[in-house]
Design a protein with these regions (language model features):
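N-terminal subdomain of lithium-sensitive/metallo-dependent phosphomonoesterases centered on the IMPase/IPPase/PAP
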Residues: 1-78, 244
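Buried hydrophobic packing segments
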Residues: 46, 50, 93, 97, ...
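An extended, acidic
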Residues: 52, 132-246
């Protein structure tokens, strides 16, 4: 059953990839601030597949749609749409299916490279069929950290990267590419930005929290969170403390 759910998410990612390949207008949609035409095209492609399955949908690009199955897919059709609009090959379709018990399946597909990260509840986390896991880093001074935004002063890390797509940044923590992730912009992210990657991180053995201790699993279009992630509990505590001090 969970594999069927994951298969649905792969089908959605395939549909978005096909629609994106036909996009020629990379400018603003004119419908709301920060939205590109490619976001609208990707969202329509995703909704076409999801509606057929009967699941509910919570998308960044449209209103909540109730379904008939008791499950909801939280989706950002294109996370990192500014990157996509400028030709930066770091943007993804991020999806997490949620049932009455919480996240049950997740997929993050880099639509520029074809790389895909996924997880099912209790089944670990994977990248293109290879099981993934985080590093064992416990010291900020040894860490390479993905970030959203620029802090007013360094947080003690060895190096940092600001790449512009939180869904992929968090997957890189799950896969041991980054040791951690810090959101330096207050209340910047909706649940569609991070939930798929949070599930992938947790199934991989990495740790993710909201800066203020709030639940990250929230089916509310208006809710915003400040995610912090790390390979180990020790590093997470240090990153949370450093971020709280900004």
């Amino acid at each position: 059953m969970n594999l069927d759910r994951l298969s649905l998410l792969h089908d959605v990612a395939d549909a978005v990839a096909a629609a994106f390949a036909d996009v020629r207008d990379f400018g603003p949609s004119g419908l709301r601030d920060g939205q590109y035409t490619l976001d609208v095209v990707a969202n329509e492609a995703a909704l076409t597949v999801l509606r057929r399955s009967g699941v509910g949908v919570l998308s960044e690009e449209s209103e909540f749609e109730a379904g008939s199955t008791g499950e909801v897919v939280v989706i950002d059709p294109i996370d990192g749409s500014t990157n996509a609009s400028r030709g930066v090959r770091y943007f993804a379709t991020a999806m997490c299916m949620v049932d009455a018990e919480g996240p049950v399946a997740a997929l993050v597909a880099n639509q520029a490279t074809g790389e895909r990260y996924w997880a099912i509840r209790g089944g670990g986390a994977w990248c293109d069929g290879v099981r993934i896991g985080p590093t064992d880093c416990v010291d900020v001074t040894d860490s390479i950290i993905g970030m959203n935004g620029i802090p007013p002063h360094p947080l003690g890390y060895r190096q940092s990267r600001v790449l512009g797509a939180v869904a992929l940044d968090l997957c890189h923590v799950a896969a041991g590419v980054f040791d951690g992730y810090v959101d330096c912009v207050t209340e910047a992210h909706g649940v569609w930005d991070y939930l798929a990657s949070v599930m992938i991180c947790r199934e991989a053995g990495a740790h993710v929290v909201d800066l203020h201790g709030r639940d990250l699993v929230v089916l509310d279009h208006r809710a915003r969170r400040t995610p912090i992630a790390a390979a180990t509990p020790e590093l997470l505590a240090l990153l949370v403390a450093a971020r709280a001090g900004l």
